[in-house]
């Protein structure tokens, strides 16, 4: 009785201190900016964040990290990628797999080189040597790696942070040289003159993966007439047959022009031929002023409309008959032939006649090789026309050359029309400036040599989503040889020596092996630091004066594409092929492809068993994030908050991680303040549900106080069965990388199954019962089992919350960390699906009653649902069976229908009531709600007819009297 306090105003007992109210240190608020770093420090201290996965005894699971570029601050794309990987790794770790996640960084390439140059003034640049540039670039890259690494750690990402792989590491560079050598020995590497994507802004060749195609590019497209100088006999015969009036009395044809269409007027000076498709039909057409042109038959009408001239068909001929026409260049005193090209010449656009500049297009180049044409390429590395372009020397092909050349074509009477043309055009992905095709001597990987093997290897890989297989298949099937050389300083050098006074190249097993050994000890800088004599193997020292070092470096995609060779095939506890590669969908043409090609070339199989791709992070309106739009979402601001905490609150890393789990990452995913609020609400619901469970366990020790599963009430057994179902559902979601299903399932479980149903019913058991009452201990047994499972289920995603829950479980646990417990298992004793049909029917009836009670509350007829009495007439057999099933266990004082419905009294059947607040008839029941009779118990709030007879406790019910008197 000493625990009973009195209300000073009413001078009667208050019973708050007799209730079993929540007690836990697990806060309602996460306080993530302080708590999450504390939990991360705990993981490090206990060697959980990396050693746990490494020390597991299960089979090895390897997710090989695609290296992000060591430049710039972390963005939402990084967050999406790294958190997805971490969710998978944590899940596999908890399943007992041996997980060794080695994070990596791509450290070479132009952007870093440009950052170094931008930080220097003109005088510093003038004194800059290649080796000084490389030293500065390496220092910059390492600084960026350190900053990005700190960000990844703050997100809760686990990995071997003490030994990441960097493409600038000595061992990595040496391994890359060895891989290059193996491809050389297999005959897959060659040097040749070919048109390649060239970036005048970067002054280097580019691979397809280094290009982007922004919208809105407009070119000056032109229709040009090339005057025919001589026609073959077969064509003359066809004209004589079909339109003899076109030939004059001297047997000569009136002036005839070949019409081409191009979007690169600056290439006209490099014209060496006009190509036609021998299978297409062409026409000689005549305008009203009697001028004649040759054009593809299917394009005549479209071209006539474009140039504004009406043409009449006069002669219909096959493309093969045009072979051998000789025409005059419109700007130079030069004649060239019409040749037969290939199927690349179509009638989808243009004129069906292709202006062929062999130095500026792959098809043009191949046609030129076929006909032994000159490979003219009058453009230098900066994009300026050279002496070969005659009077156009010095003009920039991307600036003033087009206008000047078009003007000269007008003056020559050769321009039919100039039309602005918006189309996809390749830009340098680093400088964001246009590129050109330019024929230069480059090093190539001969994809043609192992294309079929690569296509076969693609079939052996599981691609998620499946559309990824078709995408990379078409890319590999259609791609040309891979240009792997770059004219830059910051990269891994191509280890080749060129003869000073000849054409020989020194590149063999001995030289490559020697260079690789040197790099493994000293790093690639020695290529610039050492003399040739110091780089050549001993057997070549007497030839040092004969050779000079090459200056090209390797494509950065070759760097990252060789990571399988230097990381997963070399280090312990890693699988090659890797179990999984996971990157953005743009990597089908990037890292996935470069890794595939190098691995297939050397080992004839892919470096991965499974490939999973994700989309890009967009703003809430589906727009790409950019500074100009002002819509960039910073992961750091999500975690720590912005300068204005009301606008940008500090959500913590777990909310960021929960967002990742919530999205359909197979497509582009939106993120913004409204979405973050929604995710934060879900986070809060999971947290508050967990807090409620923990708060009701403050006096519970599972080893001492738990009730045997077999003796639990039906409600509790159903709750364990439902938990078992959720474990299976979430396990499947993780196994299938369907993390949004985890998000939906855990949210539904916490809100619908726990908060709105089981815990709603359990409040009376937990708060009002005596501490050791069966009603309470049975519920606490379930709460303890469920909270341990919830902690495990959310751990891969909400790793900080999961660990915080675990550390706040009030009884002793064998494991210090939830991650040491492992993945939640499902005891057989929990499973009993026969409960589901009965509980489903009762929940359906409960929902009807709740809706009716809510109506009464809205009308202010009722306050708490305990102020109500309910009468139910059951017409549905399933509902009747469910009520009978529950009634069999009423003696445990838990499985009581009025408690399930949270009302003070419930009557099944009987006469309709005279006074009701609301009633409803439906297909399965007739329900009436009236005000409860009796008196309100001040302790449990139930309305009872009989109250305590104890003069000190007349305002509580008999049930509560027993509890209070026993305290």
UniProtKB/Swiss-Prot annotation:
E.C. number: 6.1.1.5
* Cofactor binding comment, as recorded: Binds 1 zinc ion per subunit.
Q: Where does Zn(2+) bind?
A: 937, 940, 957, 960
Which GO BP terms sit in this record? isoleucyl-tRNA aminoacylation
- Short motif 'HIGH' region, span: 68-78
Keyword entries, A-Z: Aminoacyl-tRNA synthetase, ATP-binding, Cytoplasm, Ligase, Metal-binding, Nucleotide-binding, Protein biosynthesis, Zinc
Q: Where is this motif: 'KMSKS' region?
A: 624-628
Q: Name one GO molecular function term.
A: tRNA binding
Where does this one sit in the cell? Cytoplasm
Q: Where does L-isoleucyl-5'-AMP bind?
A: 583
Which cofactors, if any, are listed as required? Zn(2+)
Gene Ontology cellular-component terms listed: cytoplasm
Which residues does ATP bind?
627
Reaction catalysis annotation? tRNA(Ile) + L-isoleucine + ATP = L-isoleucyl-tRNA(Ile) + AMP + diphosphate
Q: State the family it belongs to.
A: Belongs to the class-I aminoacyl-tRNA synthetase family. IleS type 1 subfamily.
Cited HAMAP family: Ile_tRNA_synth_type1 (MF_02002)
Quote the record's domain comment. IleRS has two distinct active sites: one for aminoacylation and one for editing. The misactivated valine is translocated from the active site to the editing site, which sterically excludes the correctly activated isoleucine. The single editing site contains two valyl binding pockets, one specific for each substrate (Val-AMP or Val-tRNA(Ile)).
Task: List, alphabetically, the PANTHER family matched.
Answer: ISOLEUCINE--TRNA LIGASE, MITOCHONDRIAL, SOLEUCYL-TRNA SYNTHETASE
Q: What role does this protein play?
A: Catalyzes the attachment of isoleucine to tRNA(Ile). As IleRS can inadvertently accommodate and process structurally similar amino acids such as valine, to avoid such errors it has two additional distinct tRNA(Ile)-dependent editing activities. One activity is designated as 'pretransfer' editing and involves the hydrolysis of activated Val-AMP. The other activity is designated 'posttransfer' editing and involves deacylation of mischarged Val-tRNA(Ile).
Q: What's the protein here called?
A: Isoleucine--tRNA ligase
**Gene designation per UniProt:** ileS
């Amino acid at each position: 009785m000493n625990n009973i306090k009195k209300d000073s105003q009413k001078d009667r007992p208050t019973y708050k201190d007799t209730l079993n109210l929540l007690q836990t240190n697990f806060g309602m608020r996460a306080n993530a900016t302080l708590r999450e770093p504390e939990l991360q420090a705990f993981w490090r201290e206990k060697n959980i964040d990396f050693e746990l996965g490494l020390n597991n005894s299960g089979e090895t699971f390897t997710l090989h990290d695609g290296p992000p570029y060591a430049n710039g601050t972390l963005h939402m794309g990084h967050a999406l990628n790294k958190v997805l990987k971490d969710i998978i790794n944590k899940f596999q770790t908890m399943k007992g797999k041996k997980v060794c996640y080695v994070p990596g960084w791509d450290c070479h390439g132009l952007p870093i080189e440009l950052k170094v140059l931008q930080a220097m003034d003109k005088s510093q640049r003038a004194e800059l040597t290649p080796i000084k540039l490389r030293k500065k670039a390496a220092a910059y890259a390492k600084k960026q790696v350190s900053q990005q690494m700190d960000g990844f750690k703050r997100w809760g990402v686990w990995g071997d942070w003490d030994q990441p792989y960097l493409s600038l590491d000595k061992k990595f560079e040496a391994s890359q040289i060895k891989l290059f050598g193996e491809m050389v020995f297999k005959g897959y590497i060659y040097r040749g003159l070919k048109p390649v994507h060239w970036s005048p802004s970067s002054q280097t060749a580019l691979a397809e993966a280094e290009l982007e195609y922004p919208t809105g590019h407009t070119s000056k497209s032109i229709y040009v007439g090339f005057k025919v100088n001589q026609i073959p006999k077969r064509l003359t015969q066809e004209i004589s047959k079909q339109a003899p009036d076109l030939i004059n009395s001297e047997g000569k044809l009136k002036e005839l022009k070949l019409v081409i269409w191009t979007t690169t007027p600056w290439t006209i000076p490099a014209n060496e031929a006009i190509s036609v498709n021998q299978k297409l039909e062409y026409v000689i057409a005549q305008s009203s002023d009697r001028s004649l042109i040759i054009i593809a038959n299917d394009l005549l009408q479209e071209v006539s409309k474009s140039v504004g001239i009406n043409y009449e068909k006069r002669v219909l001929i096959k493309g093969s008959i045009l072979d051998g026409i000789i025409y005059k260049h419109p700007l130079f005193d030069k004649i060239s032939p019409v040749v037969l090209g290939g199927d690349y010449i179509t009638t989808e656009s243009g004129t069906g006649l292709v202006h062929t500049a062999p130095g500026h297009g792959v098809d043009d180049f191949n046609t030129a090789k076929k006909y032994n044409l000159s490979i003219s390429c009058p453009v230098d590395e900066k994009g300026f026309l050279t002496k070969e372009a005659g009077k156009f020397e010095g003009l920039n092909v991307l600036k003033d050359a087009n206008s000047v050349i078009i003007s000269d074509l007008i003056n020559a009477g050769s321009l039919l029309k100039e039309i602005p043309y918006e189309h996809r055009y390749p830009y340098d992905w680093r400088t964001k400036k246009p590129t050109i095709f330019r024929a230069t001597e480059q090093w190539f990987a001969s994809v043609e040599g192992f294309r079929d093997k690569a296509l076969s290897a693609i079939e052996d890989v599981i691609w998620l989503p499946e559309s990824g297989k078709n995408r990379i298949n078409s890319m590999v099937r259609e791609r040309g040889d891979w240009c792997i050389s770059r004219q830059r300083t910051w990269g891994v050098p191509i280890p080749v020596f060129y003869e000073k006074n000849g054409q020989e190249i020194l590149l063999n097993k001995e030289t490559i092996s020697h260079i690789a050994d040197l790099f493994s000890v000293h790093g690639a800088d020695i290529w610039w630091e050492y003399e040739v004599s110091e780089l050549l193997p001993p057997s070549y020292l007497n030839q040092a004066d004969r050779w000079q070092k090459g200056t090209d470096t390797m494509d950065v995609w070759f760097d990252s594409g060789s990571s399988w060779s230097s990381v997963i095939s070399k280090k312990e506890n890693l699988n090659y092929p890797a179990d999984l590669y996971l990157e953005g969908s743009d990597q089908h043409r990037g890292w996935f492809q470069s890794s595939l090609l190098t691995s297939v070339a050397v080992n004839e199989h892919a470096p991965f068993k499974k490939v999973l791709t994700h989309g890009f992070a967009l703003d809430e309106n589906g727009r790409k994030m950019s500074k100009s739009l002002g819509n960039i979402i910073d992961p750091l601001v999500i975690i720590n908050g912005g300068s204005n905490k009301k606008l940008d609150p500090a959500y913590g890393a777990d909310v960021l991680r929960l967002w990742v789990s919530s999205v359909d990452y197979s497509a582009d995913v939106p993120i913004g303040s409204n979405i973050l609020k929604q995710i934060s609400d879900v986070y809060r619901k999971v947290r508050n549900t967990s807090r409620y469970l923990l708060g009701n366990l403050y006096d519970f020790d599972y080893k001492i106080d738990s009730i045997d599963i077999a003796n639990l009430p039906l409600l509790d057994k159903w709750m364990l069965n439902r938990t078992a179902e959720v474990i299976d559902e979430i396990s499947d979601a993780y196994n299938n990388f369907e993390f949004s299903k985890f998000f939906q399932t855990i949210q539904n479980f916490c809100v619908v199954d726990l908060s709105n149903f089981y815990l709603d019913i359990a409040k009376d058991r937990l708060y009002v019962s005596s501490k050791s009452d069966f009603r309470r201990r049975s519920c606490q047994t379930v709460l303890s089992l469920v909270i341990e499972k919830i902690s495990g289920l959310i751990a891969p995603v909400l790793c900080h919350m999961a660990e915080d829950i675990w550390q706040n479980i009030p009884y002793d646990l064998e494991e210090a960390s939830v991650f040491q417990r492992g993945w939640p298992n499902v005891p057989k004793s929990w499973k009993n699906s026969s409960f589901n049909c009965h509980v489903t029917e009762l929940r359906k009836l409960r929902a009807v009653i709740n809706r009716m009670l809510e109506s009464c509350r809205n009308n202010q007829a009722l306050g708490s649902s305990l102020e109500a009495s309910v009468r139910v007439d059951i017409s549905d057999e399933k509902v009747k069976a469910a009520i009978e099933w529950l009634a069999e266990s009423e003696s445990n004082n838990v499985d009581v229908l009025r408690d399930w419905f949270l009302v003070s009294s419930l009557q099944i059947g009987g006469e309709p009531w005279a006074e009701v607040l609301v009633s409803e008839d439906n297909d399965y029941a007739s329900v009436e709600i009236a005000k409860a009779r009796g008196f309100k118990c001040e302790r449990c709030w139930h309305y009872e007819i009989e109250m305590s007879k104890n003069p000190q406790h007349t305002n509580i019910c008999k049930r509560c009297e027993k509890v209070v008197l026993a305290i």
